Amino acid sequence: MGEIEQKPTPASRLGAPENSGISTLERGQKPPPTPSGKLMTVKIQMLDDTQEAFEVPQRAPGKVLFDAVCNHLNLVEGDYFGLEFPDHRKIVVWLDLLKPIVKQIRRPKHVVVKFVVKFFPPDHTQLQEELTRYLFALQVKQDLAQGRLTCNDTSAALLISHIVQSEIGDFDEALDREHLAKNKYVPQQDALEDRIMEFHHSHVGQTPAESDFQLLEVARRLEMYGIRLHPAKDREGTKINLAVANTGILVFQGFTKINAFNWAKVRKLSFKRKRFLIKLRPDVNSSYQDTLEFLMAGRDFCKSFWKICVEHHAFFRLFEEPKPKPKPVLFSRGSSFRFSGRTQKQVLDYVKEGGHKKVQFERKHSKIHSTRSLVSQPTAPNSEVPKQSPQSASLTFGEGTESPGGQSCQQAKETKACTLELGPHQSPALPKSPPGSKAADGTTVVPPEEEEEEEGGKDGIRPSNPQPPQPSTGSLTGSPHLSELSINSQGGAAPANVTLSPNLSPDNKQASPLISPLLNDQACPRTDDEEEGRRKRFPTDKAYYIAKEVSTTERTYLKDLEVIASWFQSTVSKEDSMPEALKSLIFPNFEPLHKFHTNFLKEIEQRLALWEGRSNAHVRGDYQRIGDVMLKNIQGMKHLAAHLWKHSEALEALETSIKGSRRLEHFCRDFELQKVCYLPLNTFLLRPLHRLMHYKHVLERLCKHHPPNHADFRDCRAALAEITEMVAQLHGTMIKMENFQKLHELKKDLIGIDNLVTPGREFIRLGSLSKLSGKGLQQRMFFLFNDVLLYTSRGLTASNQFKVHGQLPLYGMTIEESEEEWGVPHCLTLRGQRQSIIVAASSRSEMEKWMEDIQMAIDLAEKSNGPTPELLASSPPDNKSPDEATAADQESEDDLSASRTSLERQAPHRGNTMVHVCWHRSTSVSMVDFSIAVENQLSGNLLRKFKNSNGWQKLWVVFTNFCLFFYKSHQDSHPLASLPLLGYSLTIPSESENIHKDYVFKLHFKSHVYYFRAESEYTFERWMEVIRSATSSASRAHILSHKESHLY
């Protein structure tokens, strides 16, 4: 990582000398070997709000990281502290000292681990070290500011006065007022200012160490000292909060303690799913054993609280760490979690028995010398205690400090790197296990009376991680021509990834998502030198590559026209399933377009051939332009406007005919399953309208690129004016037809619903949310329209469709955040006139998107004529087969866990629709996103490379509908594989990946990594632009303004 500046650590700011680690091993013991392998960097936020970066081996247990932090702080009594972080489910948990770090902190770059107090002893005099008491004082200060430590005004003022005394010394009215103005210790501090100064005046002569001691003396008497509330409900459904302390388990209503269960009374702690159970010991006069039951938000919240209780019981009640449970011979039951570390008694004995010496040091904002105990260690002959000025020696709260190099720290938020390496052949130096441990590795187990009563299956669907990673390969799509579909689940700051590739096989072998035999490394071999030489013959002018984009996308557009004009027409002619009136409306309006654009493509390719220098015409420069070709053909398109106007009518007529004819419905469904129909059929009917918009964007780029005096500028500007006029005329039709097409597409994914497509209804957003029900959080697909919100589940139906469970009219609905109320991250409460539901999103950003769109839809509904008509069908629709209806009716809450493994069934329904992708990735897509996707279509040749391969493979790639479709060449009639991009990360390879090529971008999720090479800087930027539109979504305000400036 290079040289790291030596900035003061929290311990050095207290004046503690640096040492090589405090040995806590028994005499004669050796430290356990440090795991070798790749290092990972973990950011730790200290109690003074600074951040430190630690490098530890990925496979090392959590104890390695925790000991590294304690060693960095020179902290002897580290057992009172812990490391907490939000896991992949967004639940704040403690770092398990026995499990590998990489299995707990899955995305260390995006997680900040907090070093905080974990165990609060009943008496602060049990804390032997001044540094320990100082860190406890910082924790009290933090809890005050965050509202965790609630108390009356007098207690708050007294606490703050001790903090001020330790920070700035004796009372001085002017200095006090200035300091209190700059530092806010509680939210309503202004009203307490006079009382704070009154108390501070009485602390004259009190040293910082004495101030910390007095601060803890006051704090420990408060009811909420060291209390962390966990939302729950009792058997009657009353909302309460559970907490654990050194004395036992506490029950709060709000911030008022209403009950307590002392450890001496507790016989057993367990949990089943989301039920937390406390078995009490029988009274002296009774043999009856009472069992108390509390309901928490979900299984993960319940297990997290159970672990905290186990650790508190072991730390405060046991004399030594519990012995490991013997491993079962055949079957195991319960959790493998166990307490690891020293108990409080062991910590007290160790500090009392250890050899210590007094060392002088300087404290923050004070020149008073104090003493601190350190384990006796040999010191270098010339070593000195570091001396620091009050400005640079203090823990920084709101002011910068200067490092030795002269760089300013950003208000105590700087990140320091602590590389734990002693030398080129040494493992990181870390503190070792404490004496009193029965084993060198510090392994412990939970006492038998605290075992977990966990049922065999892990049920329940968690909002931020709906499916564990599956090593097998499987098909999400019902289309046999799609060789692959890889999916991952998002999370805010994000979340765990899931791979769902073709044909879930029973052998559970990991396969690459792109498994088509024509897409492997052996196919289409090309050496890098050959490719480089070929690319260098191309012109370097950006206008050439813009013109080439017209050519490549025109090829794809022509193929899309052939789907209707050739393939669909040929299939229809073989079967008498379509009315003649419908045939005459569709095909005569596509054939002229196909003929025109075939000639248009030939002209563009001829011009590019001349531009590339395959004749001597390019010497004169007459053919190094494209504007004249664009102007001529766009003027020709205006004569085809009558056919373009008919496409909306054809789409409506087709859907009307399908609704009235079951035979035509089955015919169209069968055609959609053919390889050539890689998108929903009705999407191809709108392609001509979409293409006009693409011409407009290309001409805008050309006009922006050319200077006004360029030979091609005038033609490009004239062509842009012509196409802009056509787009403006079709703008209203486009908006209407996109919504109409999307409603009919959604209708095919839903069962149990009537009249979804009605005049005036507009689709707004679809996506996956978790609904809180009697069985916990259950995954549901939600569909938001401008008048109603539907929620569905995916059951074990033969068609892979989603069954509608309920509808919530938006008229009169309210929406509010309820994360604190239910203790579920990213939680919302939707209150309708007839029904209220609680849902949770997979991330904060997802929650905000839903809140924004639902509120907008509510506002639209309020302006309408009133409540929406009933949508739910009382019986399955007539056009569904009896088998489908029966299977749909049998779907229940209990089917949901099984529905996730039902992907291996081949269904007659398309399985690669955006509804299914959003279901598996726990994300959402809005109608605005679909509109943006229409504008961001691209195709062309790319070189593809797998993570572990050497050669590059040339593929023809089409990006449309949030997905990459792969072809062996542009002449292929259908794609060989597809890759939906929702949830993927788009980056540029780092130097460590050894790509060493220009214009390379990287797509990755989980262990799947793909590298793609473009042929020029322009094409590289264009691929990055369009793919980024699918892997990230902008805010609604930004997108609406974008659409207004690009009317179509």
UniProtKB/Swiss-Prot annotation:
Residue span, DH domain: 542-733
Positions where Phosphoserine occurs in the chain: 20, 23, 340, 373, 389, 403, 427, 433, 437, 512, 516, 836, 875, 881, 892, 899, 902
GO cellular component, one term: cytosol
Gene3D superfamilies with a match to the protein in the record: 1.20.80.10, Dbl homology (DH) domain, Phosphatidylinositol 3-kinase Catalytic Subunit, Chain A, domain 1, Pleckstrin-homology domain (PH domain)/Phosphotyrosine-binding domain (PTB)
Membrane-spanning segments: none
Biased composition (Polar residues): 371-395, 472-491, 498-513
SUPFAM superfamilies listed in its UniProt record: DBL homology domain (DH-domain), PH domain-like, Second domain of FERM, Ubiquitin-like
CDD domains in the cross-refs: FERM_B-lobe (cd14473), FERM_C_FARP1-like (cd13193), PH1_FARP1-like (cd01220), PH2_FARP1-like (cd13235), RhoGEF (cd00160)
Domain of life: Eukaryota
Gene Ontology terms: biological process: dendrite morphogenesis; enzyme-linked receptor protein signaling pathway; positive regulation of skeletal muscle acetylcholine-gated channel clustering; postsynaptic actin cytoskeleton organization; Rac protein signal transduction; regulation of presynapse assembly; retrograde trans-synaptic signaling by trans-synaptic protein complex; synapse assembly
Protein function: Functions as a guanine nucleotide exchange factor for RAC1. May play a role in semaphorin signaling. Plays a role in the assembly and disassembly of dendritic filopodia, the formation of dendritic spines, regulation of dendrite length and ultimately the formation of synapses.
Subunit structure: Interacts with CADM1. Interacts with RAC1.
Domain notes: Intramolecular interaction between the DH domain and the PH domains can stabilize the protein in an autoinhibited conformation.
UniProt-recorded name of the protein: FERM, ARHGEF and pleckstrin domain-containing protein 1
